[in-house]
């Protein structure tokens, strides 16, 4: 469960390292964001000499959460960290590589480009 002021790791090579959630997009007045939700975030840490810099406002999709995700078949998935991938307005990732495993549910949410870049889909 991601709420405003939550710090997230960045799971791609766009240049940012840490994000802080500001707002949850498209969920009305929901308090928490879950796997596959799009958030508005600010970059808190970034790699020098990269296109993205600190204090930039960006959009990101959540790909890993510490909170458990229960599937219809009874399987429960939980990750070690909260992580997101930075996307543009069309929903395409800004980076060219994705680090770590991501959930299969992103394919059903039309983030197929992110799923194709990921090394492991759980």
UniProtKB/Swiss-Prot annotation:
Subunit field text: Part of the 50S ribosomal subunit.
Name under which the protein is recorded: Large ribosomal subunit protein uL14c
Compartment(s) of residence: Plastid, Chloroplast
InterPro entries associated with the record: Ribosomal_uL14, Ribosomal_uL14_bac-type, Ribosomal_uL14_CS, Ribosomal_uL14_sf
NCBIfam families, per database record: rplN_bact
Keyword Plastid assigned: yes
GO biological process per UniProt: translation
GO CC annotation, single: cytosolic large ribosomal subunit
Protein family: Belongs to the universal ribosomal protein uL14 family.
Biological role stated in the UniProt entry: Binds to 23S rRNA.
PROSITE patterns: RIBOSOMAL_L14 (PS00049)
The UniProt record lists the keyword ATP-binding: no
Organism: Phalaenopsis aphrodite subsp. formosana (Moth orchid)
